[in-house]
């Protein structure tokens, strides 16, 4: 009867020792295509224009038929979005984990996470749909999704 526990202990020890001796490879970031980089740059420039309250740049970047969905599930239109952007962005806003999903050669969804200190919800997952119109990227659709683990945060 003592052989089974002893054999189990030896197997576990050998497995752990083998696992520790394996060289670990650092996770290399996926290469970013020129298309993806263009959209990431476009998204960053758009956010910068909002932060710096460059209203003409923001107005030109939002499509005439823009629609959005807020964290409460309500739709908002271009005029409501532009009135919000004219307030600017908090200085300590943080955007991270930007990903681009190519739909066609002229459209893509840019997703990212955003932390907005002092806002409710503070932690959001954003999805912006961009389409080229006359050679320029235009924001066609935006959806805010609260991260559920932070939906009831209080500052």
Question: Where do the language-model regions lie?
Answer:
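Short beta-strand edge/turn micro-motifs at domain boundaries
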Residues: 123-152
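Surface-exposed, charged secondary-structure patches
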Residues: 82-123
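Short, low-complexity N-terminal intrinsically disordered segments enriched in polar/charged residues
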Residues: 20-65, 103, 151-155
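A mature extracytoplasmic/lumenal domain signature
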Residues: 62, 72-73, 97-99, 104, ...
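Short solvent-exposed beta->alpha transition segments
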Residues: 56-94
């Amino acid at each position: 009867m003592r052989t089974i526990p002893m054999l189990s202990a030896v197997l576990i020890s050998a497995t752990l020792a083998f696992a520790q001796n394996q060289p670990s490879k650092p996770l290399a970031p996926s290469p970013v295509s020129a298309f993806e980089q263009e959209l990431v740059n476009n998204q960053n420039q758009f956010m910068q224009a909002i932060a710096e309250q460059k209203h003409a740049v923001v107005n030109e970047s939002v499509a005439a038929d823009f629609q959005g969905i807020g964290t409460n599930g309500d739709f908002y239109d271009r005029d409501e979005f532009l009135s919000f952007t004219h307030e600017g962005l908090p200085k300590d806003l943080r955007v991270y984990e930007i990903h681009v999903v190519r739909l066609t050669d002229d459209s893509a969804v840019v997703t990212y996470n955003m932390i907005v200190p002092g806002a409710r919800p503070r932690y959001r997952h954003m999805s912006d749909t961009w389409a080229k119109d006359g050679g320029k990227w235009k924001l066609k659709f935006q959806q805010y999704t609260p991260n559920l683990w932070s939906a009831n945060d209080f500052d």
